[in-house]
Amino acid sequence: MHHTRRMATLRRSLRLLRSFPYEQFRPRVFYSSLARDTRMLIDALANDLSLPPITNHSVLDVGGGPGYFAEAFADCFYVGLEPSVSELSAAGLSGFGSVRGDGAALPFADDSFDVVYSSNVAEHIPNWQTMGEEMLRVAKPGGLVVLSYTVWLGPFGGHETGLWQHYVGGEYARHRYAKVHGHEPKNRFGETLFAVSAREGLEWAEATGRLAAAFPRYHPAWAWWVTRVPVLREFAVSNLVLVLRG
């Protein structure tokens, strides 16, 4: 993972950390930065796994949201799948390049895409393992599959409900947010936010027999070792990247 480790610098980690507060009130700032970083990450992974450059290749974004990632993959045959009509319409996404569908039942044939990735979606659905299996199904043999998600016990597990409230409990964090702000959070525990551990992700990925790498997305490379330590990784790995081969 030479190229991927080279991009995982402390400067990058700090840049991403500074963008997190913008997610709720200036989403374009946050998601555009995350999209560019995702493209660099996938380029580096493809290089490390001796895959051809992804330019002009097919890319499926499972949970593409309001279209910010499409800009980062403009030189690819990009397809963004999003279940929410409101997310699609908010960005004016329609027709070519966008598909409404369920990540747990992808509306594509087997072996369809060179690259299949999902960024920060798994923690928002109750059946993320099914989504992961579907991602592997539609990836071409030997293709690249990247699934990254927010670990529940990491500092950002509670999303906008706060940095510590979810440690008391998901329901507590949800109700406290509603009491303070006068409305429910976008990410409602038990409905649109679920507790996914690092252990669950690693066990699922290893069971597929296709795991190529696993590391913390927002950490500099010298801190990747925390992924290998049970218990510690649940708190120290804020976002886990699972890299698999189709």
Explain the meaning of each model-derived region:
Residues 105, 123, 154:
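Active-site micro-motifs of SAM-dependent methyltransferase domains
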Residues 100, 121-122, 149:
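Alpha-helical architecture
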Residues 65-69, 138, 159:
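Gly/Ser/Thr-rich beta-alpha loop segments that engage phosphate groups in nucleotides
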Residues 115-126:
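A short SAM/SAH-binding and catalytic strip from SAM-dependent methyltransferases
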Residues 126-134, 140, 144-245:
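S-adenosyl-L-methionine-dependent methyltransferase catalytic module, highlighting the catalytic core
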Residues 1-105, 117, 132, 194, ...:
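Conserved N-terminal segment of class I S-adenosyl-L-methionine
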